[in-house]
Amino acid sequence: MIAQSVLQACVNLGVREFVVCAGSRNSVLVHGLLHHRDQVELYSFFEERSAAFFALGRTLAQPYPVAIITTSGTAAAELLPAVIEAHYQERPLVMITADRPIRYRGSGAPQAIEQSELFSVYAETYD
């Protein structure tokens, strides 16, 4: 339900393109995009940093925001260089990242990093 609400909010805000780096933790988001397939364009990438810069490039070519969806942990961290560029170029880049439960942080569990403030300096809003 949360995933569908997030995706619907993006569509309502004008996102028409989603760049996806599929992973196990963001699979519900990727699956949720199927409900919007007639409204949006999807691009699939294997590597997050390249995907983020592709999404940034799409914001330069389109008059609307572009969203990128990744799994958790270092996959989300790979977006940071493009997020910084988007910030300084004032481009509407939307990052949607999966996350592990809070109890896994600091436990040594894979892909369990502190994501809550990862983009905060360079993002207009962050929740």
Which residue ranges define each predicted feature?
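N-terminal alpha/beta PP-like core and its mobile active-site loop of ThDP/TPP-dependent enzymes
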Residues: 1-127
